[in-house]
Amino acid sequence: MTSTIRSSRAARILRAALSFAAAALAPAVAGALPFWLRLPEQVSTYAPEVDGIFHLIMWITGVIFVVVELVLLGFLWKYRHREGRVATYTHGNNRLEVVWTILPALICVMLALLSRRVWETIKEKMPHEALEVHVMGEQFAWNFRYPGADGKFDTPDDILTLNQLHFPVGKPVVVTLTSKDVIHSFFLPEFRVKQDAVPGMKTRIWFEGTKVGHWEIACAELCGLGHYRMKGFVTVDTPADYEKWLAEQAAEQKQAAAAPKEGGNS
């Protein structure tokens, strides 16, 4: 009798302590949640769509995780070992098994349909009026090639830059990506762009900047001992600043190409 009273009192104390802890921690957890889910700044047109899918998945899995853990703790407490209590066994509940099989399947189908729309925007709706840039990754740098005044690639007036990608704000950019040596991963976190650069294969991706600024280009694939230093920079310019930068690059390249000839004539 005494042990039963003590057990009941301990149960009440534990429930009260857990309730108090939950009430105290709930505001802190709710306040911290946005920081846990915080992603890099959005600077491309489709970044909000990508983040929307990510946040939806995080909320769904987060709620399911909390519910499952609470049920688990409840069962651990309710069916804990007690003196004189005989364990009972059950085959299961077919109705519950059907529910928790169908419900996750429906959630997966919903997420697949929503993700399909975002995937179509990024991978299948390549803009026609876009700036074309060729990108080649190598250990351990990014090489960018712009068409020159003739508007064609692989001609003498092509503009080449190392680890520097520029384009105007509000204009779509189509990148043709490949690699010179090993697999690299072209990663622009703020643009929500991440695509492998594979030797012998050309992959096309696109994005459009929504604000002027300067961000880092990372390689997100371990590509050798110098992987840590393989980074470049992407600069989104105003249209006027972009044209000025492009003209400066063309002039510098032309001057550099002419320098050996001038030296030879002298």
Question: Predicted segments — roles?
Answer:
Residues A30-L56, L76-S266:
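Non-transmembrane, membrane-proximal soluble domains of secreted or membrane proteins
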Residues M1-P34:
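N-terminal secretory/membrane targeting signals
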Residues F54-Y79:
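Alpha-helical transmembrane segments
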